[in-house]
Amino acid sequence: VSIFIFHFSANILVRNSEMKGKRVISKREMSKADQCTFLSYQSVAYGTLGDVAGDVSSIEGADLVATPIAAGGHLAKGATDAAMIAMDCSSIPFDEIKQQLNQRFNEVDKKLQKGAEALENVTELAEKTYSSVEKMRVEMREGFNHVIATIENANTKQIITGINQIIQYFNDERENINNRQKEDYVAKLQEPASGNFLLYLRKSRTSEDGSLHSLLFKIINQELAIPNNAADNNAIRALFALFYGTQTFISIMFYLVKQYSYLADYHYQNGNLAEFNSNFDHMKTVFQDFKFTLIGINTSNSKPLVNTVLSIIEDVKNKRFIRNLRSNLYQKIIKSTKSLLDLREKITKMDLPIIEDTPKSSVLINFREKSSSVPRIETPILKWTPGTVVKYAIQYEQDGKYSKISKWSNPITVQRLANPYITIDKDRRNRLVFRQFGNEKPELISILDSSQNEFRDIHRDLYNAAQMPYKETALGICRKLIDSGAQVGASFEMGRKSIHASATAGNDDVARLLLAKNNGLLNVPDKNGYTPLHIASERKNNDFVKFLLEKGADVNVRTFANELTPLHLAARQDFTIIVKTLMEKRGIDVNAKERAGFTPLHLSITSNSRAARTLINETPAGINIKSNSGLTPLHLAVLQNNLSAAKVLVKSNKKVKLNEMDNNGMTPLHYASMLGNLEFVKYFTSEQGIDVNAKTKVKNWTPLHLAILFKKFDVAQSLLQVRNIDISTRADQAITPLHLAAATGNSQIVKTILNSGAVVDQETANGFTALHLAIMNPNTETPQFLIAKGANINAKTNDGSTPLHFAAALGKTNIFQLLMDKGANIKAENLINQMPIHEAVVNGHLAIVKMLIEQDSSLMNAKNMRDEYPFYLAAEKRYKDVFNYLESKGADVNEKNNDGNTLLHLFSINGEVEVVQFLIQNGADFRLRNKERKSFFDLAVEFGHAGIVGYAIEENKVDLQEPYRGKTILYHAICDSVKYDRIEVVRYFVETLNEDQCSPLQEAAAYAHLDLVKYFVQERGINPTAFNNDNQVSPLCIAIVGAPCGFVKSCDTPERLDVVEYLVDKTPDINKECDTQQSTPVSSAVYGNKVSILNYLIRNGADPNKKVRGDPPLFIAAMIGQYDIVKSLVEQHKIDVNTRNKEQFTPLHAAASNDHIDVVKYLIQKGADVNAKGDENLKPIDLAGEKSKAYLRSLGRRFFRNESPSKSFEIDKFNAIMPEVSMSGKVSHDSNFIQHISSGTRSKSNFNSAKNKMYAENSHVRSIDVNGALLLLDFMVRVFSNRKMNYAASISGIKSRSNSEAQAEALILTERFEHLLNALIADQSIDSLDFSNVHSRIYKAIINGNPNGISEMLCSYAKEYSELDPEKIEKLLQEFETLTFTKSSEIQINEKFSHALFETCGLNRPTNVLQIK
């Protein structure tokens, strides 16, 4: 791990606890871009840039002002790590901020005229939804990039690559379009069909191959996003891609709606009504189509995308193993799911704010006068000229919603008269009526409410005349139109009236005429709140302004959105004459604040600043007033580089506050230093009262810090000359100017600071000295200067890194050599025990590696905290030159660690296929096995790395048909892939190789892997009720009994119950026998001690009384001591405690004979008959073990009738059979479950002859009865005493052995024998031994009643290994101790038996047998 990854806490460590004896770590190297993300610029900027753009939008030159303000905000919130600065990551990204802000301002520039938009509400709805989705996408973008980089499954990778290509094109082309000016923007959106971006995006929802919709549904339909286990990272990555792709799909939807809405309004404002209608239709169609695809409409869509994705996420959340999942990607999905749910609900309820139906073009045009009192208007007047064609169209409007526009009416040719009467159909909605002369731009002529259906087409002509540039002509026409009935209060585009039109043109005489008709028009606002005084002030119509003020216009009136007064507008435009005129009005608020808190003085700080001088010198304007973000006019003067305005402010007699801070703690001097405005800095520092050491809020930056940080070195030098400058001042993280100068690589600033008395080794909060930081910067002069100045060459950061670490990591060969020459410690370790050699290797710097190894060859074996040594790291990074060099110095690619693992093993566990390939290509022996006798291929299978598995097979690095543990490597590989729930590997074997050995369905059922069970049943078509060939057992019974925990209660898990439920659903008859030994699901649950499964089976129709070879379930449970099963059967399922088997024995007989005292007591408590007689009139006490017999006797004679002397069928105790050897009999094993599952039940005679409770451990099936234990012990006795055990006593009570019992005991003994030989034999020759043959011979000996022949047979196999030295005997003893849980100190060996297995089996024996003690 590179020092930078460690230091920045950005390394990705995945520790795999499944690897025994070795912590396994997989990592991803960070790029510089990754490291730099610690600036958190994206997250900070997303929330602030929009705010900044909005805050300063009222300011002239807002784009210039916004960037440094945003940067100042970033300084207050962003990272301040000196190391990041040295890596050139913390230089505030001015260009990026400026670019993003310019995009914001471009969007403002492209905005259509407010109030003239028919689809304004649609645009706002789409923009709001689009922005919220984009914010979600930004938050998840890094995760998606990680998915692309790490996905392993070839099929999934191909799909996700296709999704990424669509997303990238969407992002890139969208940015390309957004950067264009309005007209070019529109042209790009309306390109011909072949290259039209919007049409391309619309195809995203089609089912054609390669579309975003089809790719997302490939993930869904192939169930690639559903993990099979907690380690199924590929599925989680696919789920993340599905989620991110769905977000993009929604984003595309609202982007399209927004763009078509924009185009519609663009054409609406430009009078191109046909194009408005066309884009209106596109917008509506896109919304409906995408909404249907996303959430369905009236449930007619069976698989709506969002619903399906949310359903998959819910299914994954309900996976029982999901609680064990450790995935940042999954956590991000879950965190964002709430947002997707909210979005689904919003889209479900969402309707476009439009009117669906289109008006009819029913227009009646009448030029005849209705009243003789209203004079006719003859042509020509305005556009009414003879021969001109005029036509009309209609649009509905209601509550801000608009319809399409009707077709044009039949055109009428103008002749002698103008201004006809228009009659249209009545409607409950308002109707907008448009008029078009010839091919000129259409214009709105009237808005009719629901009660109107007739009007005279004259009012728009008054509006048009009012804004004519010729005042006298305009006045004459307006008077004529008003006399003919034109309404002075009629509204048109943007809600403007004729008074607004006259203000635009400055026609005060027309305004006087209008106000004479309706004085209420004086302060009338348009839709945006602009009054005639606003318009006149902004248009510099001074006479009109004076006229309005004389008439009593409100001088402090504000616009609706930005709350601008007329004075704001005049000051912003630098219209000094208007400012002076407005200031003459009594009551004017010269310090009125607009929405962002800016006063007119703030807005007047422009390049010319004439209005600013007026406001400062001739008005009571406050010069220290702050905006909402804390900016004073002096701040704005600096931000706009307006020194003249600054001087006016400073020199005024109003006492400007030089050190006033904005909300981020930035003074004007901070901004001047950050921007590199040297003239400003010199001017400010020459003024009395300036605080050159002022610190920002939170981060404590001074102007000197900022000048150095932003690399404004001329400003920094100027500040360093100021008399009272503090050169050692500390910002956040204890960063001094010296640290920044070293980090930014300016040796001259470093020299100046040191020559001024700064301490060379002062440390940041993270322990960095200037030397550390200088080495990290590309400049090489600075570290040399610092070393010459006596900097500590062994100084350590808080994580223990020295300058040598950084020089090694960055490949600074000359600096590294200089440090070594000066005596730097080449063995210095940081907190993860990383030395410079590790840094050099992991970053591929061969020259430095050579320097270190030649200096000290012992560094070849230097290990860090994760036991990684140079050769390991060279292999991991695949640096061939470093790898070859280390090999030439003695590194061995096949060297084994304490667990017998080579590098090839370790990287197979990690799943790093490229490293595995690299190692094999460079001499790694792929045939080597570790101490668990596993090859790199075995480990790849076990840990689920299908890429390595495929590589090994396809490149012939493994012989699948090679004999291994009695089968083949392929057989065990398939078994293991199922056992460890590695779905990708399973798919590779089954689908790619078409191999299905090992009864995979039974194996999956045994290990309770539900998804694999479903895969084999549903996708591979395996019969879920068929018996397997090896053991003749159904999947259901195997699932019930279970592996790897076998017959212990802890294996009765919810996951296993899920599998049982699934298989029961596939099983026609739940009471049918499920193996060849007549076992039923119920009897299997009893034997397996699976209480919850037993209860489920009975609840679902299983017969709790169905006998197996004559034994009812309660009898079996009592016989083997399953207390919880007995209790459940009696209490929950009301089974008779005195039920009998076919020999008439009761459960109490069975429990007492095996001495299960807890069951005995419980049965008696529940009413069991202690005098019940079975075969040969035997009572429970006749068969009872010691404890049970004592308990039964203690109950008193009141319970017993005609008690006869007890007949004991007990086996002789071990110490009676073997006086010299006494040991415990618990034995363990580890093997494929299907190879040793015992599917039979105990025979009715077994309980008479043995105490056969089934023992088990958490991780493996551990079941063997006393007879089986004696067989194994006989072999051990022969090993140590050359005596044979006497089975007479034990065999005498055995009437028969069932096939399944004999098979189970033979399998277990075979496994024990394999373990014993593994403990003795270190080489691979044991792999050639056919243990299936061993099992077959043991099974025949047991089934034929010849257990004494087993030891001889085992000896015959052991003869192949004739040399057993004392050390091997000791190992054998230790292995036996492990397998049997018997302490070696408990084994008593009589010294007179001086010969052992070695003589009995014909082997060489050691000289001192007593070493086995």
From Swiss-Prot:
Q: Name one GO cellular component term.
A: extracellular region
Subcellular location as annotated: Secreted; Target cell membrane
What SMART domains does this protein's entry cite?
Answer: ANK
What intrachain disulfides are recorded?
none
Q: Which molecular function terms from Gene Ontology are attached?
A: toxin activity
Q: Which positions are listed as propeptide?
A: 1-28, 1193-1413
Q: Name one Pfam family in it.
A: Ank_2
A single GO BP annotation from the record? Answer: exocytosis
Q: Print the keywords alphabetically.
A: ANK repeat, Cleavage on pair of basic residues, Exocytosis, Membrane, Neurotoxin, Presynaptic neurotoxin, Repeat, Secreted, Target cell membrane, Target membrane, Toxin, Transmembrane
Main localisation, per the record? secreted
> What Gene3D superfamilies does UniProt report for this protein, alphabetically?
Ankyrin repeat-containing domain
Extent of the ANK repeats: 457-490, 494-524, 528-557, 562-592, 596-625, 629-658, 664-694, 699-729, 733-762, 766-795, 799-828, 832-861, 866-895, 899-928, 965-995, 996-1026, 1031-1072, 1077-1106, 1109-1139, 1143-1172
Renumbered residue ranges of the record's region Helix H8 is the probable transmembrane region of the tetrameric pore inserted in the target cell membrane: 238-257
User: In which tissues does this protein get expressed?
Assistant: Expressed by the venom gland.
Q: Which PANTHER family match?
A: ANK_REP_REGION DOMAIN-CONTAINING PROTEIN-RELATED, PALMITOYLTRANSFERASE HIP14
Family note: Belongs to the cationic peptide 01 (latrotoxin) family. 01 (alpha-latrocrustotoxin) subfamily.
Quaternary structure?
Homotetramer in membranes.
Q: What does this protein do?
A: Crustacean-selective presynaptic neurotoxin that induces neurotransmitter exocytosis. May bind to crustacean neurexin-1 homolog, adhesion G protein-coupled receptor L1 homolog, and receptor-type tyrosine-protein phosphatase S homolog, and induces neurotransmitter exocytosis both by forming tetrameric pores in membranes and signaling via G protein-coupled receptor. This recombinant protein form channels in artificial membrane bilayers, that are stabilized by calcium ions and allow calcium flux at negative membrane potentials.
UniProt free text on domains:
The H8 helix is predicted to insert into membranes and form pores by assembling into tetramers. The helix is contained within a helical bundle domain that undergoes significant conformational changes during pore formation to allow exposure of the H8 transmembrane helix and transition of the toxin from a soluble monomer to a transmembrane tetramer.
| Protein name (Swiss-Prot/TrEMBL) | Alpha-latrocrustotoxin-Lt1a
**Organism expressing this protein natively:** Latrodectus tredecimguttatus (Mediterranean black widow spider)
